[in-house]
């Protein structure tokens, strides 16, 4: 028997031959030979393999995302899911930024771009804690420090307005802001080590 055509057409031809010979006395031998040979089952093409892999990945993702029906209940009940909360937060931020005037937008952009040097923060934390600090902890410390500096500067600007001063902030404004923040330090944890930020 000559094999002509592509590899995918060969198994079909062999199957049709086995069905045609089913009435002959040697049909059992041919059928056994066809089923035992590896050519009887067509090898899956690369596209079929990709489709199977995609289907398996989709099934696994569906299993991972299985919320036991709570997502459908929350949609029916009208409760927004986590993605809705994120979308609402982005929408609120967008509206807030649109309501800023030019000066507020400039200050916001400066605050977003301003960063504390993470290597210096890490060195300072290592020195104070007497142990090595991981990079993630240094990032957290620098983030909190940035917020603290922002609050001090904001309070110093209010003090500058109260005093009737103009121009850039002076060290006097920053000292007074730090003093007032220490008076209202109920939210900040107290430390045993007393250090003077402004001398």
Swiss-Prot record:
Residue segments, region Disordered: 1-88
GO molecular function: protein heterodimerization activity; RNA polymerase II general transcription initiation factor activity
Compositionally biased residues, Polar residues: 1-26
GO cellular component terms, A-Z: chromatin; cytosol; nucleus; transcription factor TFIID complex
Domain of life: Eukaryota
Compositionally biased intervals (Low complexity): 31-45
Xref: SUPFAM superfamilies: Histone-fold
Positions with biased composition (Basic and acidic residues): 46-57
Record keywords: Cytoplasm, Nucleus, Transcription, Transcription regulation
Family the UniProt entry places it in: Belongs to the TAF11 family.
Functional summary from the UniProt entry: Functions as a component of the DNA-binding general transcription factor complex TFIID. Binding of TFIID to a promoter (with or without TATA element) is the initial step in pre-initiation complex (PIC) formation. TFIID plays a key role in the regulation of gene expression by RNA polymerase II through different activities such as transcription activator interaction, core promoter recognition and selectivity, TFIIA and TFIIB interaction, chromatin modification (histone acetylation by TAF1), facilitation of DNA opening and initiation of transcription.
Name of this chain's protein: Transcription initiation factor TFIID subunit 11
Native species: Schizosaccharomyces pombe (strain 972 / ATCC 24843)
Gene name as annotated: taf11
């Amino acid at each position: 028997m000559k094999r002509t055509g592509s590899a995918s057409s060969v198994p079909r031809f062999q199957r049709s031959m086995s069905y045609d010979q089913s009435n002959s006395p040697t049909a059992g031998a041919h059928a056994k030979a066809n089923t035992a040979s590896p050519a009887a089952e067509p090898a899956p093409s690369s596209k079929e393999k990709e489709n199977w892999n995609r289907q398996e990945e989709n099934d696994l993702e569906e299993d991972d995302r299985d919320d036991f029906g709570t997502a459908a209940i929350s949609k029916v009940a009208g409760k927004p899911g986590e993605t809705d909360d994120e979308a609402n937060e982005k929408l609120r931020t967008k509206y807030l930024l649109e309501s800023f005037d030019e000066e507020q937008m400039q200050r916001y952009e400066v605050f977003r771009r301003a960063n504390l040097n993470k290597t210096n923060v890490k060195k300072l934390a290592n020195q104070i804690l007497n142990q090595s600090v991981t990079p993630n902890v240094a990032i957290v410390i620098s983030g909190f420090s940035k917020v603290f500096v922002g609050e001090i500067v904001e309070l110093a600007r209010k003090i500058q307005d109260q005093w009737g001063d103009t121009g850039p902030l002076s060290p006097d404004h920053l000292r007074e802001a730090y003093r007032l923040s220490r008076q209202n330090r109920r939210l900040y944890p107290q430390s045993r080590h007393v250090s003077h930020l402004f001398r």
